[in-house]
């Protein structure tokens, strides 16, 4: 059976996901069989495994760092918010329905056996399990039915390291307050703290670290600097969205929908050296981009209504009327249609007018499509005609289908897909310079990136030599190794290994982590 180590954080975005990924890579480099585990993740960023199961992207990253194929056992429960008060509940990789917060808390005790089975199964195949907590472990109103933080640590007898984000301020208060709010049986699990996202001279910080240790009787395992590694990380979402910089020769605007999902679709675009990728949420931010992308959404009708009310829909239509390209992915593709129907109340229920840029209709259904695909672009028209015949890989996660309207002669399918099952089907639609697809990950292909860059540069009268940008797999491996190297420099790994070996019975909390 595997030995556990758990990373908790004083708050959301404290850096738990990245620290977990880094430890997974370190332990793997050191020759151990390693797997990540997060009992419950709440995120709009998800991934489809080879067997069609859906799981959180953070655990996919951690699995890759551990050299493992993503496995839904690593994230048995995924909550995908559909509104301010409700989420779609994914259990064991499959949706079991939408629930309000109240309904979920009434139901969650039924989920505990699924968590135990998933963990025990992983434990039999690995030497170390790196567990990630969720949010803050000191939410005293949620302790009774907790199975994501200290409730899980107690169930699995896991030692805990608690991370605090010093970049946002108040790290000593948050670490002290978190530990002091723990019950006595919870405190015995806490074997160290980590100061995360530090900028500056550690020497100036040391007096505070000593005082913190004296107050909570828990050692500081390390001070982690603000790391600049390019890893698909839930915690970096707000930073990615707010990043400002000069416009590139190519200006790509991604609409920052309120319920944007699978934002990792656009990470690869940031590797086009002559391009800038901006996330915009208002007409005052849109400007005059060369390409507008409407991303996936967990609530297509709600986010279309939001765009309609804030004026972005009109701006996108004007952009398309100038024969400038618009690309919709999944929910964004659905918004481009003439009509949207929701006969089963999957989202809002009823019918809604779409943007009308593609002559098609979307109908939401109860069953969710979840599959990995291989695709080949059809004969593509418009600015991106160079994509014709190019191949790609990706995955589908959506409710319902989109069909061309009767008598429509102007639009055609964008690509042909082959599912893992062997089933083949057309996907997406195109008309002029408006394109839509259900496939996530369509840009994660070097040849496709080069074609898109060349087309946009040519449209502006600029020369562009098609070339290789990067090998995505090799690039990710390099980033995971950089993360591991950085953590080895600043964490007391000898102490962490000792904690893993001795578990919660370890009473000698001596470390020189800073």
UniProtKB/Swiss-Prot annotation:
What InterPro entries does UniProt report for this protein, alphabetically?
Class_I_gatase-like, CobQ/CobB/MinD/ParA_Nub-bd_dom, CobQ_GATase1, CobQ_N, CobQ_synth, GATase_3, P-loop_NTPase
Query: What does the record list as GO biological process?
Result: cobalamin biosynthetic process
Task: Determine if Membrane is one of this entry's keywords.
Answer: no
Q: What is the superkingdom listed in this entry's lineage? A: Bacteria
Single GO MF annotation: catalytic activity
Q: Which residues form the GATase cobBQ-type domain?
A: 249-448
Under which pathway is this protein filed? Cofactor biosynthesis; adenosylcobalamin biosynthesis
Q: Which residues form a coiled coil?
A: none
Q: Which residues form the active site?
A: 330 (nucleophile), 440
Protein's UniProt keywords contain Transit peptide: no
Which keywords label this protein?
Cobalamin biosynthesis, Glutamine amidotransferase
Family to which the UniProt record says this protein belongs: Belongs to the CobB/CobQ family. CobQ subfamily.
Job of this protein: Catalyzes amidations at positions B, D, E, and G on adenosylcobyrinic A,C-diamide. NH(2) groups are provided by glutamine, and one molecule of ATP is hydrogenolyzed for each amidation.
Report what the protein is called.
Cobyric acid synthase
């Amino acid at each position: 059976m595997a030995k556990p180590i758990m990373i908790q954080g004083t708050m959301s975005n404290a850096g738990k996901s990245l620290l977990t990924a880094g430890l997974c890579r370190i332990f793997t480099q050191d020759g151990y069989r390693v797997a990540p585990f997060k009992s419950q993740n709440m995120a709009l960023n998800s991934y489809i495994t080879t067997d069609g199961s859906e799981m959180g992207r953070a655990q996919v990253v951690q699995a890759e760092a551990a050299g493992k194929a993503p496995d839904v056992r690593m994230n048995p429960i995924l909550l995908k918010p559909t509104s301010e008060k409700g989420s779609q509940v994914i259990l064991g990789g499959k949706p079991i329905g939408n629930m309000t917060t109240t309904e979920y808390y009434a139901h969650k005790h039924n989920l505990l056996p699924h968590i135990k089975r998933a963990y025990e199964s992983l434990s039999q195949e690995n030497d170390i399990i790196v567990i990630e907590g969720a949010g803050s472990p000191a939410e005293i109103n949620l302790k009774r039915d907790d199975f994501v933080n200290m409730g899980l640590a107690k169930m699995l007898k896991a030692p805990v390291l608690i991370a605090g984000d010093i970049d946002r301020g108040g790290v000593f208060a948050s670490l002290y307050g978190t530990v002091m709010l723990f019950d006595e049986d919870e405190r015995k699990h806490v074997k160290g703290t980590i100061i995360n996202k530090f900028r500056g001279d550690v020497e100036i910080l040391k007096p505070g670290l000593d005082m913190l240790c004296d107050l909570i009787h828990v050692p500081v395992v390390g001070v982690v600097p603000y790391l600049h590694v390019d890893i698909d990380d839930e915690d970096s979402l707000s930073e990615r969205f707010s990043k400002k910089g000069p416009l590139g020769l190519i200006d790509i605007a991604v609409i920052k929908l309120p319920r944007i999902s699978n934002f990792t679709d656009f990470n690869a675009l940031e590797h086009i050296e002559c391009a800038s990728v901006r996330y915009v949420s208002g007409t005052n931010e849109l400007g005059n981009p060369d390409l507008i992308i409407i991303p996936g959404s967990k609530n297509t009708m709600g986010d279309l209504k939001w765009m309609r009310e804030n004026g972005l829909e009109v701006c996108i239509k004007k952009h398309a009327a100038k024969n400038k390209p618009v690309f919709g992915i999944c929910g964004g593709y659905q918004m481009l249609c003439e009509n949207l129907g929701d006969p089963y109340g999957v989202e809002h229920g009823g019918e809604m007018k779409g943007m009308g840029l593609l002559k098609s209709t979307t109908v939401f259904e109860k069953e969710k499509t979840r599959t990995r695909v291989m695709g080949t672009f059809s004969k593509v028209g418009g600015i991106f005609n160079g994509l014709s015949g190019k191949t790609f890989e990706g995955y589908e996660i959506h409710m319902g289908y989109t069909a061309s309207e009767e008598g429509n002669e102007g639009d055609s399918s964008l690509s042909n897909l082959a599912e893992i099952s062997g089933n083949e089907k057309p996907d997406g639609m195109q008309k002029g310079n408006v394109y839509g697809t259900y496939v996530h990950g369509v840009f994660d292909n070097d040849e496709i990136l080069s074609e898109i860059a060349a087309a946009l540069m040519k449209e502006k009268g600029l020369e562009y030599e098609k070339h290789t940008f990067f090998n995505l797999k090799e690039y990710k491996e390099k980033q995971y190794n950089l993360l591991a190297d950085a953590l080895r420099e600043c964490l007391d790994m000898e102490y962490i290994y000792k904690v893993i070996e001795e578990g919660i019975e370890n009473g000698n909390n001596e470390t020189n982590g800073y």
